[in-house]
Amino acid sequence: MSLTRLLIKDFRNIESADLALSPGFNFLVGANGSGKTSVLEAIYTLGHGRAFRSLQIGRVIRHEQEAFVLHGRLQGEERETAIGLTKDKQGDSKVRIDGTDGHKVAELAHLMPMQLITPEGFTLLNGGPKYRRAFLDWGCFHNEAGFFTAWSNLKRLVKQRNAALRQVSRYAQLRPWDLELIPLAEQISRWRAEYSAAIVEDMADTCQQFLPEFTLTFSFQRGWEKETDYAEVLERNFERDRMLTYTAHGPHKADFRIRADGAPVEDTLSRGQLKLLMCALRLAQGEFLTRVSGRRCLYLIDDFASELDDARRGLLSSRLKATQSQVFVSAISAEHVMDMSDKNSKMFRVEKGKITD
């Protein structure tokens, strides 16, 4: 699946744009603040319903406008799909697929699996566990049909349980929430464990190519003690949870630990090495999806040259080309991406929100 056309209206500093895209590499070149990252963000938003630089909708809609509008055309092997997303200042969204309203953002995410690599993406490695849970959950979402519904229900139940902890005095009063929560928690943890076990070899192989000087290990931690039933954990920790007023154990506390030569990667690797590792993990995840489902990711890479020398840029470029996926790359200078270009690539110049090819 590739994005063949993108229409942008009133998104960030872009008043209007209509882009015909390459199924291969698409380069966005311009000075800082020109709007090149806004194009990447528009694509990301079309597939996620939210921007990656700000959760405040007012900062994403162009100044003095009421809403942004994004439209795209996706070309699959057998058919083309038209998609659209409109979002106003109140945060209300309208999703259209093939001309019909009433669709969910999750449907867009399923149609457009994508991997995002940005200078801020180091949080996958040096941020809190929620970023690594999101990494696993992306894979589970695209590999398990029931994951999104289960995950949404889990979030709702944990929130309700936390609210109930402020009101109850005995565990029996909390049991109705736990009877719903326990099977969901165990199912989501099984999916995460199965996914992490399935992808770990792909990650290790790709990371070895990018960072041969390190031995990297990966471990999934489900959020409560091994070999212990979640029901037992919840009941045993009731008084502590009640004092804390939140549920201290469960899949919402899971983590996916990454170590280099036995130490946390954030304590061992340089910024350039962390970026390489982040790229390797995103590539491995995208390639795993293709291998198990036949579907290809879109790759969005912001500020391609930052933190990487010529050799490392060349390695990333060659691996991206090998995926045969659609790739969007932003850079300050065309010189930084010329080695990636071929006869099927497209180069877009971005200046003050205006885009030309």
From Swiss-Prot:
Q: Name one GO biological process term.
A: double-strand break repair
Kindly give the PROSITE patterns that the UniProt entry links to this protein.
Answer: RECF_1 (PS00617), RECF_2 (PS00618)
- NCBIfam families named in the record: recf
Compartment annotation: Cytoplasm
Tell me the lineage of the source organism.
Bacteria, Pseudomonadati, Pseudomonadota, Gammaproteobacteria, Enterobacterales
Residue ranges crossing the lipid bilayer per the database entry: none
Q: Which GO terms describe its molecular function?
A: ATP binding; single-stranded DNA binding
**Which UniProt keyword terms apply here?**
ATP-binding, Cytoplasm, DNA damage, DNA repair, DNA replication, DNA-binding, Nucleotide-binding, SOS response
Q: What's this protein's function?
A: The RecF protein is involved in DNA metabolism; it is required for DNA replication and normal SOS inducibility. RecF binds preferentially to single-stranded, linear DNA. It also seems to bind ATP.
The record's listing under Pfam families reads: SMC_N (PF02463)
Task: Return the similarity comment.
Answer: Belongs to the RecF family.
Offer a single GO CC term for the protein.
Answer: cytoplasm
This chain belongs to the protein called DNA replication and repair protein RecF
Q: Which residues bind ATP?
A: G30, A31, N32, G33, S34, G35, K36, T37
Question: So which domain of life are we looking at?
Answer: Bacteria
UniProt-listed InterPro entries = DNA-binding_RecF, DNA-binding_RecF_CS, P-loop_NTPase, RecF/RecN/SMC_N, RecF_2
